[in-house]
Structure formats: C-alpha cells, structure tokens
C-alpha cells in the first residue's frame, strides 16, 4: 500500500500544501498561500479547516488533508490481490475480507456470519420482523431500504436500469441481468436428462418436470395440474370467485394481477406498474 501520483496528487504534497498556510490567531478566514492548481482548495476558518471544494469543515489539519485526497483522486490504500484502491483505511480493511473470507460479524440469533456490520444489521430484521421503510403511496412496509426504493419506482414509473443494447428499461437490476441473456445468447441451465439448455431457470424447471413428476400441483375441484403452487393458487380463484386486486379509482376488483395491471395502466397514462 503506497500513496499514488505526484505533486499535489500525493499525501506528502497535500500535507505540504496545508502546512504552508500561515494564519495569525486573529484571522477568521485565510486562503492557503501555496503553489499549484488546487491552492484555493483548503482554507482556515477560526479553529476549523474548511474544504473549498465542497464546504465540509474539519477541526484538524490532518482530517482535512485526508479528506482532500478524495478531490485530488489520491487513493492511498491499494489491494495487492485485485488492484482496487481506497481513500480510507476502513474501506480497505473491509474490502480485504472479500479475499480472506473473514466474516467477523455474527448473528446472535442463528449464528450466521457476515463480513460487514451493515449486512448483519439488515439481516437481523428477519428475526425481529422490523420493517422500518413504509411506502407513503400504498402503506406497504419493507425491511430493506434497497427493496423499498425499488418498490417506490413502481409508483413513480421511474426505471433506473437500462439495456445498452436495445434501450429497454427495468425497475430492478436483476430484471436487466435476466433480460441481457437475450442479447448474449447465454443459456446457463442444462437439462441433465436430455442435454437441452435454457436461458431462464423458470423455463428449465418447467422442462425438467416433463422428465419427472409432470405437474405436481393439482386442483381438487377439477383435477387440472400445474407446475407451480402459485399457478394453482391463481387457478383456484376461478372456482372460489376471489378477487384480491382492487382498482381504487373505480372500486373494481380482479381475480388476476395481469387484469388489474392492465386496468391500472389506463389510470397511469400507459405506464407499466
């Protein structure tokens, strides 16, 4: 691990830049009297040090110097395994756990271990049942902030993940990854019985049923069989008359989500929900 770059792009250069600053006790604000393209970046403000790039204030020179490495592009800590570099030692140490396999954060409930404390804290919500993120649009709650953000996009119509090949956009990165297989031709799922390959696991699973038990989920009312339990659940509504999807605009209910989504597109101006 060694500082990179030269001039102001090094740790020594940054220290020199700050230490050249001469400030009397009566000065409220003083610009660094240093040489180089970034000479106005660091200023002394009373007993604090302020970064002129972003306005962040520090109470020590050393903290300001370390912070300025972000603006200067200096990454002091470099991983010898993969070459990735970091501004902060704490980030470097955390990254090294990926290579070492170290997982120091342990769940006291079940013993599962993690390499980051933040991952452990998120995981513990499985045991506590805590769902701190609530959607203001529909009231649905979520354990994880990332899932909450993705859900919120279904209300705004925003789709952050775009395919560079065809421009199609998606709410979820996993959906984009799945879609990309269409362009790459990747078929990672291979049937052990006949050797046929498939792009999607769902299609592969459905195919594998033809070699084994067929359709394991059977309707008790009419005897129709299904590959998946959710397909049987959806079919059962044709017998029970259950309609769990309700359009709040017209108070109309639907037995199937596809019909509900089609109705919702009318109200949302054609945006997929």
Swiss-Prot record:
UniProt keyword annotation of Zinc-finger present: yes
Superkingdom to which the source organism belongs: Eukaryota
Keyword presence, Disulfide bond: no
Gene Ontology CC: nucleus
UniProt-recorded Gene Ontology molecular function terms: DNA-binding transcription factor activity, RNA polymerase II-specific; RNA polymerase II cis-regulatory region sequence-specific DNA binding; zinc ion binding
Zinc finger (C2H2-type): 49-71, 77-99, 105-127, 133-155, 161-183, 189-211, 217-239
Family: Belongs to the krueppel C2H2-type zinc-finger protein family.
Its biological purpose: May be involved in transcriptional regulation.
Protein name: Zinc finger protein 80
Organism: Gorilla gorilla gorilla
Lineage of producing organism: Eukaryota, Metazoa, Chordata, Craniata, Vertebrata
């Amino acid at each position: 691990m060694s500082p990179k770059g030269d001039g102001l792009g090094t740790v020594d250069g940054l220290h020199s830049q700050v230490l050249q600053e001469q400030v009397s006790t009566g000065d409220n604000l003083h610009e660094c009297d240093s040489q180089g393209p970034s000479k106005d970046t660091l200023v002394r403000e009373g007993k604090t040090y302020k970064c002129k790039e972003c306005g962040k204030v520090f109470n020590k020179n050393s903290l300001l110097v370390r912070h300025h490495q972000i603006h200067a592009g200096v990454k002091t800590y470099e991983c010898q395994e993969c070459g990735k570099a970091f501004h902060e030692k704490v980030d470097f140490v955390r990254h090294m756990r990926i290579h070492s396999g170290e997982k120091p954060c342990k769940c006291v409930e079940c013993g599962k271990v993690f390499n980051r404390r933040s991952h452990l804290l998120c995981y513990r919500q499985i045991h506590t049942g805590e769902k701190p993120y609530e959607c203001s649009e529909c009231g649905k709650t979520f354990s994880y902030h990332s899932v909450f953000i993705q859900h919120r996009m279904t209300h705004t119509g925003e789709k952050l993940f775009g395919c560079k090949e065809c421009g199609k956009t998606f709410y979820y990165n996993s959906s984009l990854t799945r879609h990309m297989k269409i362009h790459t031709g990747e078929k990672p799922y291979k049937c052990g019985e006949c050797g046929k390959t498939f792009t999607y696991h769902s299609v592969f699973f459905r195919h594998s049923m033809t070699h084994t038990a067929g359709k394991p989920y059977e309707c008790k009312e009419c005897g129709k069989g299904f590959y998946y339990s959710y397909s049987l659940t959806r079919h059962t509504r044709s017998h029970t008359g259950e309609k769990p999807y309700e359009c709040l605009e017209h108070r109309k209910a639907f037995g199937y989500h596809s019909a509900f989504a089609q109705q919702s597109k009318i109200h949302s101006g054609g945006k997929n929900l």
